[in-house]
Regions:
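Gly/Pro/Ser/Thr-rich low-complexity, intrinsically disordered segments predominantly at protein N-termini
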Residues: 1-156
Length: 156
């Protein structure tokens, strides 16, 4: 198990439990595939897992995976791997923060059900675009080289 860490969510510090072994394997696999996918896209940077990202004075988040634009470090893809014993912070609180901050993409990777919820921002907020499982392929149109079957992700 990894070390606990803190996030500033809606002006309050929240102590988050250290992710478990499966969580960390999934995170490492996702980073490995994503790193290869962004290598040819200098406009995008992949941040280290759970790097502190201050959004404003009320929110400092630490997503499991984050892609930012190289020009201004603006977060454009956040990935949260949901922990069964600490899921509310990711699935409710942080999801609302991502929506309020108009983050263009959010993936909720849920090892409890071996699925991935893919959200896209529009003028009304975050919209659920797909719930992927099994042999369905997780892709991102802004990163044409990124393709990963959900089954492969959860075998990590």
């Amino acid at each position: 198990m990894s070390e606990p860490y803190e996030e500033l969510l809606s002006g309050e510090w929240h102590l988050r439990l250290g992710p478990g072994e499966r969580h960390e394997r999934i995170c490492a696999r996702l980073h490995e595939i994503m790193l290869a996918s962004v290598a040819n896209y200098p406009a995008t940077k992949l941040l280290p897992p759970r790097m502190k990202i201050p959004l404003n004075q009320y929110h400092t988040i630490r997503p499991d995976l984050a892609l930012v634009t190289s020009a201004n470090n603006r977060l454009w893809l956040a990935v949260e791997i949901v922990s069964a014993d600490d899921h509310r912070a990711d699935t409710v609180i942080k999801k609302q923060i991502y929506e309020d901050m108009k983050v263009p993409r959010l993936w909720m990777v849920d090892p409890r059900y071996d699925n991935v919820e893919v959200y896209f921002a529009n003028e009304y907020g975050l919209v659920l675009g797909a719930i992927l499982a099994g042999d369905e392929i997780l892709t991102e149109k802004l990163l044409p080289e990124f393709q990963l079957t959900v089954r492969e992700l959860f075998l990590a």
